[in-house]
Amino acid sequence: MSFFDGIPVAPPIEVFHKNKMYLDETAPVKVNLTIGAYRTEEGQPWVLPVVHETEVEIANDTSLNHEYLPVLGHEGFRKAATELVLGAESPAIKEERSFGVQCLSGTGALRAGAEFLASVCNMKTVYVSNPTWGNHKLVFKKAGFTTVADYTFWDYDNKRVHIEKFLSDLESAPEKSVIILHGCAHNPTGMDPTQEQWKLVAEVIKRKNLFTFFDIAYQGFASGDPAADAWAIRYFVDQGMEMVVSQSFAKNFGLYNERVGNLTVVVNNPAVIAGFQSQMSLVIRANWSNPPAHGARIVHKVLTTPARREQWNQSIQAMSSRIKQMRAALLRHLMDLGTPGTWDHIIQQIGMFSYTGLTSAQVDHLIANHKVFLLRDGRINICGLNTKNVEYVAKAIDETVRAVKSNI
């Protein structure tokens, strides 16, 4: 007999399960388009040169130690991260009504923000986009939200943002509902609202007294321009809207396993900040208590040293540019093959992911017959493509959509 008898086996986390399937595959030709991480033209992880140089500098700095950071995190990092997403000239910064909280990457920021809203502010209803990142619903359910609902985001027939239903669903949301918005490079679709559409979304959220929770995991990585990628967030701030923003530095700094994140908070009344920070400290104390220093030190040094920041800008532009080239190459090969269906959405999307429109049956066929590994909803990581495998992937998709029919 065990205290743990009868515990059911949970289904595997798909993205990591598919990644393991790829690693275990013994076929001589295989392609991994699953896990959300950047890869070079050679298919390898990339340590940004500026990150490596900064790590060496930190390692040689004998003034540093391993004492605990404050509960809310590395002060310089928090300030730099908040300025990165809001802009140094943001009214929220100038009026001292914003601040950052260091968290364990984007997931930790989502969890801390969600738990705070549920336990301190008694917000229990959240809306996430349909489709959305696979972890959003789980995080908010575990944080204490009792209603986790969807708003329409994707037009599956026309492969575009379904702005009409998006706005209609927001209109129907109860007052004080939390609305999760992807700041840029929507995961999994890779398609963002236009600036005019963002303005419509902001108008409804403000008028209906809904609460905005932005999740921005790809700032700078999406377009190569950190300011452009944060446009929607800065517009909402300019409209006088309160919000929290989950930031991740996994993709744009390549610091996946350092778990570097920030929760930027924007309020309308600076007088509430002391209470907010004190209650947030209790939320974090009961979770990870104190955040790790290494990744935060790297990001802080890079963002606050002009020469290093310029190096970082060049790196994110290089990553963004390679992704765009691979999108164009995949589309070109599909067009050359005369692949049935419409595929222009591949180059209309941004960031590392493409929501291909492939069905689950077609995904199973691609994996079984071509050893091209991707998620069941048809999401592919464009970073997994390179000049050596993109034609193979296009031919695999072409054979698959001819063999396994759908309405693409």
Swiss-Prot record:
Cofactor(s), by name: pyridoxal 5'-phosphate
Summary of the tissues where the protein is detected: Expressed in all somatic tissues including the nervous system.
EC number: 2.6.1.1
Effect ascribed to mutating residue 184 to Y: In hp731; decreases glutamate levels. Rescues the defective backwards locomotion or 'reversals' movements phenotype and decreases the increased glutamate levels in ubr-1 mutants
CDD domains in the cross-refs: AAT_like
Domain of life: Eukaryota
First-listed, main subcellular location of the protein, grouped into a coarse class: cytoplasm
GO molecular function list: L-aspartate:2-oxoglutarate aminotransferase activity; pyridoxal phosphate binding
Quaternary structure and interacting proteins, as annotated: Homodimer.
Function: Biosynthesis of L-glutamate from L-aspartate. Important regulator of levels of glutamate, the major excitatory neurotransmitter of the central nervous system.
Protein name from the UniProt record: Aspartate aminotransferase, cytoplasmic
Organism listed in the record: Caenorhabditis elegans
Encoding gene (name): got-1.2
